[in-house]
Every structure is written in structure tokens, then in C-alpha cells.
């Protein structure tokens, strides 16, 4: 006979979007949803474009945000994509949302396909991620720095970035 306090119930991590992707044959790894209850899914860079295209065809027609972050020295560089279904919004119904994450080995190939062909709004967002973290977006029509000078060395938001000792100050006059 077991005590009720000893029963361990495994929490199901996968959500409806992860299940839908799996049923369509797309490899994905569901992660714990974020603090807002948004489903978070890990995908490989090779599957990014086809998965986002499938999600767009299923109604996720707005790329709310694309960005990156550094997990720390020696760890991954992560690209994330927040997709939303923007249709007729009703006050009592929240739109469907999903966050996709692509984990890249910082010492490996930091290339992912560009989403510019699906979402024109990815243009500057991908350029910023390139500029700050060094992620290359294959197929991007304007692959150049956005915030830093073209001759800047390194990726300033990486946690292993070594700051240069000298900055040339430009007079505004």
C-alpha cells in the first residue's frame, strides 16, 4: 500500500504545438513553458525554415520577435523566435503563441537559415543578432552589421567578449 505523498506524477512538458509538429513529422524537443505560459520548443537549425513555414501555414502569421542570447562562456549561443497567430483578436481570447529556440555550439557553425523570405520583419532583428552574437543567417539579403561599425572586431554581447582598450570618440560637432 502506498502513501499519497509518495506518488510521483510526471509533469507533461509537451504542449499542443509541439504535439502538432511531432504529428506532422517535425523533430522537436519540448521545453518547459515560460513564466507567461508560452510553449517553448527546441529545434535544430536544419529544421528551422520548414518548421516556421509549417507554423505560418497553420496560422502563426506574425514574427513578434527574433533575438539571441549567450548561455555563458563555453556554453551555447541561442537564437529564439516568438511567433503569434494574429487574426481577429477578441477580448476574451488570447492569440496562440509559441517560442522556438535553436541552440548553437559557440565553437561550431553559428549559421541558421534566415526567416526573411517568410517574414520581412526578420531583416533588422537577424542583423542585430548577427551584430551582437555572431550568428550568420543564411539567405539574408543584407548580411551586415546594424549597430556596430563595419570594421568592429568581435561580438559585444557574448559573455566571453573581451572589450577593446581604446575607443575613438567622435565629436558631434
Curated annotation (Swiss-Prot):
This is NAD(P)H-quinone oxidoreductase subunit J. It catalyses: a plastoquinone + NADH + (n+1) H(+)(in) = a plastoquinol + NAD(+) + n H(+)(out); a plastoquinone + NADPH + (n+1) H(+)(in) = a plastoquinol + NADP(+) + n H(+)(out). One of its GO terms (molecular function) is NADH dehydrogenase (ubiquinone) activity. GO terms for cellular component: plasma membrane-derived thylakoid membrane. The keyword NAD applies. NDH-1 can be composed of about 15 different subunits; different subcomplexes with different compositions have been identified which probably have different functions. It is an enzyme of class 7 (translocase). PROSITE patterns: COMPLEX1_30K. It comes from the Bacteria. Keywords: Membrane, NAD, NADP, Plastoquinone, Quinone, Thylakoid, Translocase, Transport. Gene3D superfamilies: NADH:ubiquinone oxidoreductase, 30kDa subunit (3.30.460.80). Its EC number is 7.1.1.-. One of its GO terms (biological process) is photosynthesis, light reaction. The gene is ndhJ. It is found in: Cellular thylakoid membrane. NDH-1 shuttles electrons from an unknown electron donor, via FMN and iron-sulfur (Fe-S) centers, to quinones in the respiratory and/or the photosynthetic chain. The immediate electron acceptor for the enzyme in this species is believed to be plastoquinone. Couples the redox reaction to proton translocation, and thus conserves the redox energy in a proton gradient. Cyanobacterial NDH-1 also plays a role in inorganic carbon-concentration. It is a peripheral membrane protein. Signal peptide: none annotated. It comes from Prochlorococcus marinus (strain NATL1A). Belongs to the complex I 30 kDa subunit family. Disulfide bonds: none annotated.
Amino acid at each position: 500500500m502506498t502513501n499519497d505523498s509518495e506518488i510521483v506524477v510526471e509533469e507533461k512538458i509537451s504542449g499542443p504545438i509541439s504535439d502538432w509538429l511531432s504529428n506532422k513529422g517535425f523533430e522537436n524537443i519540448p521545453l518547459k513553458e515560460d513564466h507567461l505560459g508560452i510553449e517553448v520548443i527546441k529545434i535544430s537549425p536544419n529544421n528551422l525554415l520548414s518548421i516556421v513555414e509549417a507554423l505560418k501555414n497553420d496560422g502563426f502569421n506574425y514574427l513578434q520577435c527574433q533575438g539571441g542570447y549567450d548561455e555563458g562562456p563555453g556554453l551555447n549561443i541561442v537564437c529564439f523566435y516568438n511567433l503569434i497567430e494574429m487574426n481577429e483578436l477578441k477580448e476574451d481570447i488570447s492569440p496562440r503563441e509559441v517560442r522556438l529556440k535553436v541552440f548553437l555550439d559557440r565553437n561550431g557553425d553559428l549559421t541558421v537559415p534566415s526567416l526573411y523570405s517568410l517574414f520581412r520583419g526578420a531583416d533588422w532583428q537577424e542583423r542585430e543578432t548577427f551584430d551582437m552574437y555572431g550568428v550568420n543567417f543564411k539567405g539574408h539579403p543584407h548580411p551586415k552589421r546594424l549597430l556596430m561599425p563595419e570594421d568592429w572586431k568581435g561580438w559585444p554581447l557574448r559573455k566571453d567578449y573581451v572589450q577593446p582598450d581604446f575607443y575613438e570618440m567622435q565629436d558631434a560637432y
